[in-house]
Amino acid sequence: MLRVTVEDLGTDLRLKVEGRLAGAWVPELEQSWRTLIRRSPGVSLIVDLTDTEFVDLAGTYLLSLMYRSGVQLRANSLYMKNVIAEITAQAGAKCI
């Protein structure tokens, strides 16, 4: 199961992703992301993966697309930090 919520932080929008980003849930996150960037062009977007438990290959690919478009990826768990490190390394950047 996946839960996606949006929080307006003033100058940024936070997309909080909770649960498992896998299988049929990946297109759900993609739709939420694309809707946000269409409705709020020019606003910085932060994807909060603090409560994300698992990401499959399709989810990793989507997060990579999001990162390359300028989205900031945030996480606390070692697992998710490793996922982000792989994504940023592939993009030629440092993990934050």
Where are these regions (language model features)?
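STAS-like cytosolic regulatory interaction modules
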Residues: 1-96
